[in-house]
Amino acid sequence: MVTSDKYYPYDRPPLSKEYLRGKIDRNSIFFEQPNYYTKRENIRIILNTSVEKINVKEKGVELSNGTIIHFDKALIATGGRPRKLKLPGEELEGIHYLRTLDDCDSLKQENGKEAVIIGGGFIGIEVASSLTMLGVKTTVIEVKPYIWNTFVDEKISRLIQNYFEKHGVNFILNEGVKEFIGDKRVSRVITEGGKTLNVDFALIAVGIVPNIEIAQKSGIEVDNGIIANEYLETSAKDIYVAGDVANIYDPSIGKRRRIEHWNNAEYTGKLAAKNMLGKREKYNFLSTIWSDIFDLHIESGGDTTDYDEYIIRGNFSVDNPNFNVIYLKGGVIKGYVAINRDYEELSALNKLIVSKVDVSNKKNELKDEKYDLSKLSL
């Protein structure tokens, strides 16, 4: 494994949550200690090194240190990098991105009491929760009309926003940032609408850009990521792709997409390994997305954007939210967004999405919390 990272593999989801809040220590972030890898003869990890080019015909990779490594099969799992805003003052001290362990360590060193987060997506909202719990007055600026707009619909977004506001988080919506101002260090954020916010530090969290450059330079097909077939093969023979950078046809929703979440990265990594070893197993996975913010556990599966009706199961309220919004199209469950629901219910819904069972005449059962949803797939 060749990586430009200086650390052995570690768990990224806690960076915006438990690790940022100091609930877990630095060692627990790592999947294994270094000797786990170094004592194994069949595992070699090259740190602090990038791949400059892949010679797809000769089956060789050229490293940044000039070394050439030949392969029988290769996997590209380059992920993504934080999207930059390229605004005046963005180079000032106190302006952060969050993607790596070092990014989080830098953010943890901030001791100011007022922060601005630009971006109301996953990372932005999770960090807003964490900073607020640490006693930092936090404002989220989102250019779209509502937060988490690629993940939930407006009614759920408004409920989550209200829940955050009850915990002290401020929001500026439908408005972007114009510039950052400060003398060496950021002290003010100016919005496009002319608002001025005094800040001690800021986080920019406006999504990621897939790292496709190595594929582009090597003549491998790209389009919003690196194009993969159902076996996770790229357009180049014996070269596979996995994780956030992979553009995959998702049979659960019937279209191609890149999935920027942990469980899909884990699944595609394992599937690519199987296929590189000759198993020939097709991609067949319903990716679920989850987040923990304040005392809410939010989970979603399937497609929550393409629907003709929805059913609410549970208590859809900002006071003690505990519900599941189930999205249907043509009588078939397409997806769901759930807050504080149990594993059995979500597992049953995942199976119903995959099996495409017609539940047109079972809407009362979907609403009834006492009804066991697993019976619908029998």
PLM features: what roles do these ranges have?
Residues 1-43, 130-152:
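Beta1-alpha1 glycine-rich phosphate/pyrophosphate-binding loop at the start
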Residues 3-5, 100, 120, 143, ...:
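Cofactor-binding loop segments of dinucleotide-utilizing enzymes, especially the Rossmann-like FAD-
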Residues 44-65, 69, 134-228:
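A Rossmann-like FAD-binding core segment of flavoenzymes
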Residues 78-134:
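Glycine-rich dinucleotide-binding loop and its adjacent helix/turn
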Residues 91-112, 181-190, 195-271:
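FAD-site-proximal beta/loop scaffold in flavoenzymes
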Residues 107, 359-378:
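Cysteine/selenocysteine-centered motifs that mediate thiol-based redox chemistry or coordinate metal-sulfur cofactors
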Residues 245-347:
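Mid-to-C-terminal Rossmann-like scaffold of FAD/NAD(P)H-dependent oxidoreductases
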Residues 342-359:
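A short, polar/charged loop-to-alpha-helix boundary motif
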